[in-house]
Structures are given as C-alpha cells and as structure tokens.
Regions:
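Active-site C-terminal subdomain of aminotransferase-like
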Residues: 138-139, 153, 192-260
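PLP-dependent aminotransferase-class I/II
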Residues: 102-140, 144-147, 154-161
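General beta-strand structural signal in soluble alpha/beta enzymes
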Residues: 6-9, 58-62, 84-85, 144, ...
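Catalytic PLP-binding core of fold-type I/II PLP enzymes
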Residues: 154-186
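Conserved PLP-anchoring active-site segment centered on the Schiff-base-forming lysine
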Residues: 74-92, 121
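Conserved core of the PLP fold type I
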Residues: 55-76, 106-113
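Conserved N-terminal alpha-helix of the aminotransferase class I/II PLP-enzyme fold
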Residues: 16-64, 86-91, 97
Length: 260
C-alpha cells in the first residue's frame, strides 16, 4: 500500500468495520432522537451489565473534551475546582474548556502522570487550614486519566486509595477513560469495569480513540449526581439529535461482529 503510516495519534483512521457495517445496516431506520431510541437503550443496558451496575446512569457524548467539561460543570458548585495532575488533559490539552465553565483546575505535581491519595488529602487539608479558604476555589472533585497522559496505569490499590480518600473528604472521583480500552487490555492492568463502577462516582468508556468514528459513554454511579444530568448535557451543547449513532457504535464495539 502507498498509504502513509502515521504515529502522531491513535485516531487517524475511521472506525472498526463492525461499526460501519451496523451504521450502514440501520441507516434508513427512523428512530426517536436525542439518545432515547432502542439502540441507545440496548447499549446502556449492555454497559450496565458489563459494569455490574444495573442502576448506573449511562450517557453518550460525541467527544472527550465535551464529556469532561460537562461532567465537571454539572457536578461541581460554582465556587468549586477540580484537583488533577499537572499533566492532566483538562489542565494542559483542552484549551481551558473546564475553566471556561468557571471551575479552576487545581493542579498537583504528578509522577509519570499519576497523583496519589496522599496528595489529594494534603491539598484538601491545606485548603481548609487556610484562614482565607473562602477566597480560594474549594476542591470539589478529583480528576484522573487512566491510562494517564504518560501512558502509565493506575493500579487497583491506587484507585482504591483515591476512592477512599475522596469519600472521606466528600469529593467526587471522576476518571477520564478516553483510552480506557487500552488500559483494560494491558498485561500490566489489574482493574476491570466493575472496579471502576464500584470505586468511582463517574467514569467514561472511550470510543473515539478505541474503534468508533466518535463517541464516549459516561457512566454515573451515584444516583444523586445523575439526577437532571441530561439537562446539563443539553445546556452544554452535547445532546446529539441523531443520538442513535452513538448507541449503535457502542453496540457494535461491545457486541462483536454484527452488533447483535
């Protein structure tokens, strides 16, 4: 082949063939819009089953930046910020999208892309120990990427420690899973989808960089946080009119050859 092989990113191709096949097979079907169709319902059900989280909220987004700033803005109070690695995507590679919603990225120094539960605890304690804490963005969430921006993986022990610290401090734990499929397939990985569902308030299973044309599936494991979340999706311009295109792609990716 005369096609150039490119290494600058992992999403230079279109999509896995089963995705294209299922989109073509269902192209002329008429369905309800905005993610309220049977295909999205099936995809939500399949994701809940894989996560062993029958009550989880599952919401489809077109892209990861869109998912990140919508989740952060919807879950935080106006005066709160999000603790993250200094190398974290929301801090350095999303053109200030989160901060454009009014929430400061509270960056912590990372080691190979990771932050620790102790760093979170120290940052939380330092905020409340400051006599001027009402003049400073209040930590309200912890954001991590897994795999990290450095290609490293959080272990189950590390994620468990982060989860416990967030629970103790009343912080939401949000995992950016744009490349989660890579991590799940790694021989070095000891986490599964059930672990993410048990340990995180919110995470997402990325499609855009993992075989879909586009699409991210946000899973919300806290029913209090899921309430009215669709209002936030719409307000942030993230509710796709032809929402079935997202559900279909996840069906194809998760079900196999023909998406059925």
């Amino acid at each position: 082949s005369d096609l150039m092989i490119r290494f600058e990113c992992d999403y230079g191709e279109g999509a896995a063939q089963p995705v294209l096949d299922l989109l073509q097979k269902t192209n002329l079907e008429q369905t309800p819009g905005y993610g309220m169709d049977d295909y999205c319902d099936q995809a939500r059900g399949l994701i809940r089953k894989l996560c062993d989280a029958p009550d989880a909220g599952v919401h489809f987004f077109v892209g990861a930046t869109q998912a990140n700033f919508t989740v952060v803005d919807a879950l935080l109070k106006p005066w709160q910020g999000v603790l993250c690695a200094d190398s974290g995507h929301i801090n350095v590679h999303e053109t200030g999208a989160v901060e454009a919603t009014g929430h400061k990225c509270l960056a912590l120094p990372s080691v190979q892309g990771k932050i620790t539960a102790q760093q979170v605890r120290d940052a939380y304690d330092a905020h409340w120990a400051d006599a001027s804490h009402e003049h400073i963005a209040q930590p309200g969430m912890v954001y991590i990427s897994n795999p990290t921006e450095d290609g490293t993986l959080y272990t189950k022990e590390e994620l468990t420690d982060l989860s416990a610290t967030c629970y103790d401090c009343g912080l939401c734990l949000f995992v950016d899973g744009a490349r989660m499929a890579y991590g799940l397939a790694s021989e070095a990985n000891d986490l599964n989808l059930q672990d993410y569902a048990n340990l995180c308030d919110v995470f997402y299973l990325g499609g855009t960089k993992c075989g879909a044309l586009f699409g991210e599936a946000v899973i919300i494991n806290n029913p209090d946080l899921d309430q009215d979340f669709r209002y936030a999706i719409k307000q942030h311009g993230a509710m796709l009119a032809k929402g079935r295109l997202l559900g279909l792609q996840f069906l194809a990716l998760l079900n196999g050859e023909d998406g059925t």
